[in-house]
């Protein structure tokens, strides 16, 4: 696994999601009670890829499910280069849509 090797080298001080121990409660407020076998401190299943392109889930429960279905169907495939409206006062998103308030 290429990911496993990279994970080990990540210093705990970097504040990345992959530290050997779960981060203290003060640093990560999203800690949830024991779920179905996944690490307790990472509610979304597995930790994100060690990548700057990782999109942090926005506020609200629907932040993730909103991403895949925009007003025009689905967003473009390359999430990084997709032209999203700027996350300004109304909240941007994929050119507006039902979830703009969340984003």
Swiss-Prot record:
Region described as Disordered: 1-103
Superkingdom assignment: Viruses
Composition bias, Basic residues: 55-65, 74-84
Protein name: Uncharacterized protein RPMS1
Similarity section: Belongs to the epstein-barr virus RPMS1 family.
